[in-house]
């Protein structure tokens, strides 16, 4: 099984565990608010601003080694469905790689792609597309 399949499987397992513990899983929806990572069009590279956001997340994860997160990668709607899903995964993988390089245990992190299925805005404009090109870190609780 390749890494992408394992990551997706891990995320599904975390989400299914959430279904059984609905009262505590509201935290699954908790996002590092104001700390989303944005990407350039059709790119998965992290810029300095994104790295600063991820440094904060890495510090928190290292201080809370019992906590797990899911990194969700997204794309704007301009590509094909397959391309956007692949790009979303590359973005999630880039975030995970940076967090791991920063000292976070890789077992704390699952990755998944949403592609362009959950847009940040309904604006079909350059500004809206910028908001769609993101990766979010969601905290999972047990």
Indicate residue ranges for each PLM-predicted region.
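Periplasmic peptidoglycan-binding/tethering modules of Gram-negative envelope proteins
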Residues: 18-68, 136, 141-142
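Short, flexible active-site loop motifs that bind/organize anionic cofactors or intermediates
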Residues: 8, 41-44, 82, 99
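Short, contiguous, well-ordered secondary-structure segments
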Residues: 49-74, 83, 92-97, 101
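Sec-dependent bacterial lipoprotein signal peptides
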Residues: 1-18
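Generic structural signal for beta-strand residues in well-ordered domains
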Residues: 11, 30, 62, 102-104, ...
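Periplasmic OmpA-like peptidoglycan-binding domain that tethers envelope proteins to the cell wall
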Residues: 74-142
């Amino acid at each position: 099984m390749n890494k992408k399949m394992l990551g997706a499987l891990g995320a599904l397992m975390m989400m299914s565990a959430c279904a059984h513990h609905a009262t505590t899983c509201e935290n699954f929806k908790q996002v590092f608010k104001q700390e989303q990572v944005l990407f350039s069009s059709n790119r998965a590279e992290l810029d300095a601003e994104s790295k600063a956001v991820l440094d904060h997340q890495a510090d928190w994860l290292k201080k809370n080694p019992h906590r797990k997160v899911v990194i969700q990668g997204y794309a704007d709607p301009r590509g094909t469905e397959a391309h956007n899903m692949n790009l979303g995964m590359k973005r999630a993988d880039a975030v995970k790689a940076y967090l791991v390089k920063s000292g976070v245990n890789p077992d704390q992190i699952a990755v998944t792609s949403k592609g362009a299925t959950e847009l940040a805005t309904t604006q079909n404009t350059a500004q809206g597309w910028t908001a769609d090109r993101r990766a979010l870190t969601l905290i999972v609780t047990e």
